[in-house]
């Protein structure tokens, strides 16, 4: 369960990074 949560967090971080790059 912790692994799944960490995977979701990693994906969320990647999505945020992509959104930030698009804003620039």
From Swiss-Prot:
Domain of life, per lineage: Bacteria
Induction: Expressed equally in exponential and stationary phase in rich medium (at protein level).
Protein name from the UniProt record: Protein YljB
